[in-house]
UniProtKB/Swiss-Prot annotation:
GO-annotated biological processes: queuosine biosynthetic process; tRNA wobble guanine modification; tRNA-guanine transglycosylation
Molecular function (Gene Ontology), one example: tRNA-guanosine(34) queuine transglycosylase activity
NCBIfam families assigned: Q_tRNA_tgt, tgt_general
Protein name: Queuine tRNA-ribosyltransferase
Organism field: Streptococcus thermophilus (strain ATCC BAA-491 / LMD-9)
Keywords, ordered alphabetically: Glycosyltransferase, Metal-binding, Queuosine biosynthesis, Transferase, tRNA processing, Zinc
Residues given in the record as substrate binding sites: D96, S97, G98, G99, F100, D150, Q193, G220
Enzyme type, top EC level: transferase
Amino acid sequence: MIDFPIKYRLIKKEKYTGARLGEIITPHGTFPTPMFMPVGTQATVKTQSPEELKQMGSGIILANTYHLWLRPGDELIAKAGGLHKFMNWDQAILTDSGGFQVYSLAEKRDISEEGVTFKNHLNGSKMFLSPEKAISVQNNLGSDIMMSFDECPQFYQPYDYVKKSIERTSRWAERGLKAHRRPHDQGLFGIVQGAGFEDLRRQSSHDLVSMDFPGYSIGGLAVGETHEEMNAVLDFTVPLLPENKPRYLMGVGAPDSLIDGVIRGVDMYDCVLPTRIARNGTCMTSNGRLVVKNAAYAEDFSPIDPECDCYTCKNYTRAYVRHLLKADETFGIRLTSYHNLYFLVNLMAKVRQAIVDDNLLEFRQDFIEKYGYNASNRNF
């Protein structure tokens, strides 16, 4: 039996749902699950220091392979001693494969069996990313958890296209496993695709589970489908994945989606949402989203969220944060970003406690009622 560098330990199953409390052991420490992972695209979580991320309880962060491969280059990071030393982060790091960025950012991409040829979005130069190259770059980065190179088809692509795509993704996953130079200290996850088609998700899961990865990601969601469609895919996909390994739902950060994923047995999430909306002055609060830049808060001397105990809410008022944002002061973005990240990391801590107490469905109902979801704001 392979001794994987990434191990999942189940602590408790929730009585009334598929939710599970656990922990993931990595070469750079252990973190509890379910967990939300802040995204550090360019080897930094925008405006936040490693110390601040630790304060808020982030045991793992994500970095983007595509961006770091293009700039400053994976070989330079390897010379620095790997990503942990380069960015002074001594806890777990997960890297994606670069595939999603190739499909979403790059121009004029051409997908073949060998890989993807595309134009560098920074300078227009021609680039080629293959399963082997994606693994090689991540081996140089030295992340604790790596992703297989996959194609992320759009959710509403035709069935025949998605079928060919998942079959190619399975072949790419096998090639990536063979190219992996550091299986002793980097865990490589397989990525299940298949859009909204149950039989294709089943086929993709079967292919990848047979390859015995140390963990599995669910890709191809949060790409334009409805909340109900996402939940339906999770309902038939999560049970196909091994119970003794981590389950990671990629690119999901809306609070209700996090809770609904946990109910269905998901352990890990990542998303740029909390920092992206923070830069526009939008804050997640216990009572729903709050656009602190609005004129209504010019003389509001209460915290962004009176129920939040983060650094921002304990020390600064809505009026002050609004002033900073209106004056284009970076500190304002730091404060809103810290708050939003803390909100999601802390939400997962509350979810973990609800699993312990066997009252996750009640917790969900209370949260949704208070947050006030409706069609206009459900993405926040």
